[in-house]
Amino acid sequence: MYVFGIFAVMIAVGALIGAVTNHFAIKMLFRPYKAIYIFGKRVPFTPGLIPKRRDELARQMGQMVTGHLLTTEGLKKRLASDAVKSQAVQVGERLLARLSQSTATVEEALESIGISNPAQKADRAVSRLADEKLTAFLEAYENEPLKKLFPLEAQEKLKEKIPMVSSYILSRAVSYFESDEGKERLGHMIDDFLKERGMLGSMVQMFLGNSSLVDRVQPEIVKFLKNGETAGLLQDLLENEWDKLKEYTFKEADDKWNLKPLIFDLKEKLLKRFSLQPFFEKTIGSSISSFEQDIALRLPQMADRLLEEAGRRLDQALKQLELEQIVKEQVDNFPVERLEEMVLSISKREFKMITYLGGLLGGIIGAVQAIFVILI
């Protein structure tokens, strides 16, 4: 009976110590949540293991997530998968269908996301860009001959038009001098000419008469203008002037004819003529409807390119996101109480088995101790 009592007591005490020790060891993983101080001295094993190592745990989890879970290679492989491509195409199709039925104007859509007066801003941006490009272009070619500003093909075509221009000038001149207005103008010119000649002019005018002189000069002028040699002379003159003009540098031409204001004025007129305002006044649906089918056919190709570009920029994007720092901050801010609750709810059965195992080992150790006590 004595021996049985010793065994029972030693086993019970050992089992109790083992079970309680393991139970407290499990609890001390999380508790106490904060360090406890007595007389300014921190009590050992406070705070619990996880609260004490929270910073290190957060850092290690951040490194684990970025180094082993959300890796660039894994994300790239996911982006390149057929499932993601299919989802991207489906999203594009839904977006295209919604936009094609939209009755909002482009301007209204942009204003709804905070962009006010988009048409005016777009026109100003285009004008500013055109000014910058045009100014840079003119400065770069300021000391170059004009022929370098135009393609050789354009120069040849312009030269081919010279006979036509010459013929047009002469035909207009003939029409003018044959008209009453031209005849009257010619009469005034003859009067002015004779007045400048003084007495000689008065004598000629007295003998011939002004109207008689005009009637004689007008046919001769018309005859001269219709003469083939006159056409050839004018054509040669225009070709010579064109060849000289091509050799002018832009700076020389600008100094002579003040070209820059003309060029920029032409630019302003062209921009006003082709203002972007009508585009912004159109509905999104009408803007898309004309090429909706083309977009739908190209959606798979567009999705592939978009995902490929996303994959190329993934490294930089992940660095800018600083996922490791985000995970660390989230772990730092996660309540220890909630973490304890989660771990215990998941591993409650296992923790109980650890407690029971501690009791079993403690009981075995107690039995061994009882044997030694009896033998001694």
From Swiss-Prot:
GO CC term, one of those recorded: plasma membrane
Listed InterPro entries: DUF445 (IPR007383), UCP032178 (IPR016991)
Name recorded for this polypeptide: UPF0754 membrane protein BLi01057/BL02871
Tree of life domain: Bacteria
Transmembrane segments: 1-21, 356-376
Keyword ATP-binding set for record: no
Location in or out of the cell: Cell membrane
Keyword Transmembrane helix assigned: yes
One Pfam family hit: DUF445
UniProt keyword terms in alphabetical order: Cell membrane, Membrane, Transmembrane, Transmembrane helix
Membrane-topology annotation of the record: Multi-pass membrane protein
Source taxonomy: Bacteria, Bacillati, Bacillota, Bacilli, Bacillales
Protein family (similarity comment): Belongs to the UPF0754 family.
